[in-house]
Swiss-Prot record:
Biased composition (Acidic residues): 135-144
Matches recorded under Pfam families: DUF4677
Disulfides per UniProt: none
Organism: Mus musculus
Protein name: Coiled-coil domain-containing protein 184
Length: 191
């Protein structure tokens, strides 16, 4: 029968039918492994890019840290220089001979190199007769100027003191006070 079919087909002038192509279906394992390999390749490339960026950041940070370290070194050198200067100044101040500079121990605030001249009275004092006075008289005048503790000093005590009345004379008048003093005294009296 098959021979008759072949003869009919060849009589019609047709060609022999081509064999059917069988499509091969990939195995499930191959699909999974391909997906896995492709995903891992992408993941590795992504991680590589991230590591490269991280290395660049680390380099930049290291450069900044080196710069900061150089600034810190400069500041440290300045601090050490200032400290040495302070120590040397303290040594100079403690070992220098004390000659009374700046008026502390040298007398009247002058430098030790300036000689002190004795104070001479001006020519007008001799004319007034102060040089020819007796020193005892000066002491008596000083005693007169200092107030006696028994004598009252304030204006209120002056007016109430019985010692202000003379034996035969009138009452001693208090000195004229400025208006401000009178106002203060009136304020104290009202209290």
């Amino acid at each position: 029968m098959e021979d008759s079919l072949l003869e009919i087909m060849t009589k019609d002038g047709g060609d022999m039918p081509a064999p059917l192509e069988v499509s091969t279906v990939p195995a499930v394992g191959d699909v999974i492994s391909g997906e896995y390999n492709g995903g891992m390749k992408e993941l590795m490339e992504h991680l590589k890019a991230q590591l490269q960026a991280l290395f660049e950041d680390v380099r930049a940070m290291r450069g900044a840290l080196d710069e900061q370290a150089s600034h810190i070194q400069v500041l440290s050198d300045d601090v050490c220089a200032n400290q040495r200067a302070i120590v040397s100044m303290c040594q100079i101040m403690t070992t220098a001979p004390r000659q009374g500079g700046l008026g502390v121990a040298g007398g009247k605030g002058s430098f030790p190199s300036v000689p002190h001249e004795p104070e001479t009275p001006s020519p007008g004092i001799e004319d007034s007769g102060l040089l020819g006075r007796d020193p005892d008289e000066d002491e008596d005048e000083e005693e007169k100027e200092t107030p006696n503790p028994a004598t009252p000093t304030s204006h209120c005590e002056l007016s109430e003191s019985p010692g202000l009345l003379g034996e035969d004379g009138p009452l001693v008048e208090p000195p004229d006070l400025p208006d401000i003093t009178l106002l203060q005294l009136e304020g104290e009296a009202s209290l």
